[in-house]
Amino acid sequence: MARLNRNDPQLVGTLLPTRIEADLFDLEVDGEIPKSINGTFYRNTPEPQVTPQKFHTFIDGDGMASAFHFEDGHVDFISRWVKTARFTAERLARKSLFGMYRNPYTDDTSVKGLDRTVANTSIISHHGKVLAVKEDGLPYELDPRTLETRGRFDYDGQVTSQTHTAHPKYDPETGDLLFFGSAAKGEATPDMAYYIVDKHGKVTHETWFEQPYGAFMHDFAITRNWSIFPIMPATNSLSRLKAKQPIYMWEPELGSYIGVLPRRGQGSQIRWLKAPALWVFHVVNAWEVGTKIYIDLMESEILPFPFPNSQNQPFAPEKAVPRLTRWEIDLDSSSDEIKRTRLHDFFAEMPIMDFRFALQCNRYGFMGVDDPRKPLAHQQAEKIFAYNSLGIWDNHRGDYDLWYSGEASAAQEPAFVPRSPTAAEGDGYLLTVVGRLDENRSDLVILDTQDIQSGPVATIKLPFRLRAALHGCWVPRP
């Protein structure tokens, strides 16, 4: 990386690249790590290994997988590049060969037809596999301990979709993994593929359908009997790609569509409901009661990324604020509208839950929160990826319990670890990486969910800074 534009808002603060592959044995710990925390906290971070081209976005950096391995009160850290086909080509060339975000028509001719995914968004674990994934391609399998890249993963040839969401859903009752691929037949196509994979890695259900219009889709929801697909007006366009323009455009005049499909239904059975133009990056949980479906999610008025707008309006950050919201869908109603209720006004994102209680009406959710009563150490461009606080949302009280990370600090997406396999919902610990911006390094903090406001029970210190990650997961030791 010979040159780096340090005036680029996507390359400063918590977003400043580090590009560090590391092996750290027995990290320094302040406090005491709870004995029940034995396993691995995996994270995935976009890291540009070469200087990005002029028209770039933070979410297009190469995948950098990292892992905190916990064992009997000790923690080791490891980070490795996800060695995709794209990473390998640019490593050999020592320069950027891939152009605009998800636009192959802007690439160097030497990489025409090469798999463009950077596998940088999430780490998932299922049927003994650890996978790095981004929604523009198929996952890459990693070694669970060393994080070395094993290769592109298509479920042993069972998955023919060209893409795979970074937010598959795990059913704790059956062990099934449910996921979709959008633009499943290639960039800017309206095709959706939907799969169910059993706990042994066998595809037990597959169906295809088309979106009402081709659109960017990031997350979805499942209940015991239904899968729900939100289609929102961040549209894609092959003609825009060929004209070497950004792939996405915000077209609010199209409104939003919510597809409701029986969990093992065929694409022809999907029912499309309507909603106004809005945006949802992430779902907390969904459940059903009788003929009603409830979905807790993070909703904003517009797409939080400043892609072009069909109405030529400037990007409005105040409309891009995600807030905890509940959707209610009545399947017995003749109306094609959904009911939407805002649960809280604070900026909040990157939600997780106690996944043992998925598919039922959960009490608790855990997420990054910007508490407006406290100072912010991060800038506008960082606001989807870093937060001044962590929050525990309590559906019974209708409010957050908050932990403030500090005046020169920024917390990231948490992971939840139950206190024991049989612990009550939400009883356990939150793990989160915190950037110490004034020290140019990071900590991993452990918070007790029973008393989050008292601060960390343990702080694991890193001697360098970790770039803001997107998503990860906790995997207990067998």
From Swiss-Prot:
This enzyme may be useful to construct bacterial strains producing vanillin economically from the abundant natural product isoeugenol. InterPro entries: Carotenoid_Oase, Quinoprotein_ADH-like_sf. Changing H167A: Loss of activity. Disulfide bonds: none annotated. Fe cation binds at H167, H218, H282, H471. One of its GO terms (biological process) is carotene catabolic process. PANTHER family: BETA-CAROTENE DIOXYGENASE, CAROTENOID 9,10(9',10')-CLEAVAGE DIOXYGENASE 1. This is Isoeugenol monooxygenase.
